[in-house]
């Protein structure tokens, strides 16, 4: 049996990011062969990762990457917010965004199969799950393309807690597009303009507003006028271009972009963990532990 030295253990740890005992066990198992030790850890990592699939990954980071006229926005989840500060995790999220922009996959299955330096996006996620010790999952992505006379705007809030990707037609000024992306991160509009709002959503809101006005005891002829005004306000609140621009509330987003020769074409906003139901027992345990202190 080959001697396993502290130097060998350190080298393997540097290569893989695993703990000291795991590195030593791997080297002993393969009799000091460094390449086989790496393979052993990755193989065992895949087995460990598979056992973590029942965990809920509701934290993490979102990111945006642009490659020429193609951009990608991605969300990669972890189990705890602490991992979002991990350099390996941050690099993984950036790499995934870049690879998705370069390859333009149409489905998550295609995205997972994209080749990377170490293997595929899927195998990189499994390796990260093993090394970091938390379930790491690639939740979603969107690929967006633009014309030559358009600009991408990318903005990350809180280091990637919120990511926004915008497309502004008619100008190549990326600062304008970024300003709009910043506005979207802060205000969270749901549509670019009124025409995108589904009719059933408007009908539902109209019914609610009508009931509100009637409950206020207003006469029928006044109710109709009130509902028209309130419905218009509702549409402006959820449609991006009609909102007061955060950096200059005296003008709307539409007027700001138009003053730069552009027009908002589209946007995508990812907020990490939105729509994922977190386990309540984690929060309860946290509260109980604080009460004991």
From Swiss-Prot:
The keyword DNA repair does not apply. Coiled coil: none annotated. Gene3D superfamilies: 1.10.286.20, DNA helicase RuvA subunit, C-terminal domain, Elongation factor Ts, dimerisation domain. InterPro entries: EF-Ts_dimer_sf, Transl_elong_EFTs/EF1B, Transl_elong_EFTs/EF1B_dimer, Transl_elong_Ts_CS, UBA-like_sf. GO terms for molecular function: translation elongation factor activity. The keyword Protein biosynthesis applies. One of its GO terms (cellular component) is cytoplasm. Keywords: Cytoplasm, Elongation factor, Protein biosynthesis. Transmembrane segments: none annotated. It is found in: Cytoplasm. Residues 80-83 are annotated as: Involved in Mg(2+) ion dislocation from EF-Tu. Belongs to the EF-Ts family. Associates with the EF-Tu.GDP complex and induces the exchange of GDP to GTP. It remains bound to the aminoacyl-tRNA.EF-Tu.GTP complex up to the GTP hydrolysis stage on the ribosome. This is Elongation factor Ts. It comes from Enterococcus faecalis (strain ATCC 700802 / V583).
């Amino acid at each position: 049996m080959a001697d396993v030295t502290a130097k060998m253990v350190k080298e393997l740890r540097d290569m893989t990011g695993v703990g000291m005992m795991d590195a030593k066990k791997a080297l002993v198992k393969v009799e000091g062969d460094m390449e086989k030790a790496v393979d052993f850890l990755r193989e065992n990592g895949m087995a460990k990762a598979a056992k973590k699939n029942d965990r809920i990954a509701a934290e993490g980071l979102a990111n945006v990457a642009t490659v020429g006229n193609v951009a990608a926005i991605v969300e990669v989840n972890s189990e705890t917010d602490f991992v979002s500060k991990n350099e390996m995790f941050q690099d993984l999220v950036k790499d995934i965004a870049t690879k998705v922009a370069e390859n333009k996959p149409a489905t998550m299955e295609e995205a997972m199969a994209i080749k990377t330096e170490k293997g595929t996006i899927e195998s990189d996620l499994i390796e990260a799950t093993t090394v970091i010790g938390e379930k790491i999952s690639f939740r979603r992505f969107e690929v967006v393309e633009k014309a030559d006379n358009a600009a991408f705007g990318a903005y990350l809030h809180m280091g990637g807690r919120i990511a926004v990707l915008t497309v502004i037609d008619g100008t190549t000024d990326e600062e304008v597009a970024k300003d709009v992306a910043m506005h979207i991160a802060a205000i969270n509009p749901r549509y670019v303009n009124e025409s995108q709002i589904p009719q059933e959503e408007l009908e539902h809101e109209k019914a609610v507003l009508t009931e509100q006005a009637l409950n206020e005891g207003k006469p029928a002829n006044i109710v109709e006028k009130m509902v028209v005004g309130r419905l218009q306000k509702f549409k402006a609140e959820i449609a991006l271009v009609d909102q007061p621009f955060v950096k200059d509330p005296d003008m709307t987003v539409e007027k700001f972009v138009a003053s730069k020769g552009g027009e908002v074409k589209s946007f995508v906003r990812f907020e990490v963990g939105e729509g994922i139901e977190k386990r309540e027992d984690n929060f309860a345990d946290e509260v109980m532990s604080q009460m004991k202190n």
